């Protein structure tokens, strides 16, 4: 069954292997790295992250159909948090500094970034962010 991106959730799935590889390389993932991936979609980025063998991968995914697809694809190799990223408290996840990957939805990109910057300044949760935005968000 082919999954279609939901415009209402601002979904845009990564499929270009070259782009995915560049994103993963930018993360400098080590064996003790703890990863947070926001909106894993169909799991193409997740698969490449797993090849680097990080300590743990947390995925926040709101779309119930994608959550099921990710569970089927990755079994117990990842921890899925089936919630809206804006409603997740990072202290539920953070046992060490996180490397955050995300192809952020246009409609909530600014809110997510503001939340993370504010929380990180207070709690120092994040080691690195590798985020993709639509050009319109970056221009703002």
Could you describe each region identified by the protein language model?
Residues 1-140:
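Catalytic cores of RNA-modifying enzymes
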């Amino acid at each position: 069954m082919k999954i279609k991106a939901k415009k209402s959730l601002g979904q845009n799935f990564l499929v270009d292997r070259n782009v995915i590889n560049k994103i993963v390389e930018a993360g400098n993932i080590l064996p003790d790295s703890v990863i947070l991936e926001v909106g894993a979609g169909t799991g193409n980025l997740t698969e490449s992250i797993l090849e680097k063998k990080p300590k743990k991968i947390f995925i926040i995914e709101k779309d119930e159909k994608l959550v099921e697809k990710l569970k089927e694809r990755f079994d117990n190799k990842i921890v899925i948090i089936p919630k809206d990223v804006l409603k997740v408290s990072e202290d539920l996840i953070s046992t060490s500094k996180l490397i955050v990957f995300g192809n952020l939805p246009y409609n909530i990109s600014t809110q997510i970034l503001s939340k993370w910057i504010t929380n990180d300044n207070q709690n120092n949760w994040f080691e690195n962010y590798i985020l993709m935005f639509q050009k319109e968000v970056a221009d703002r």
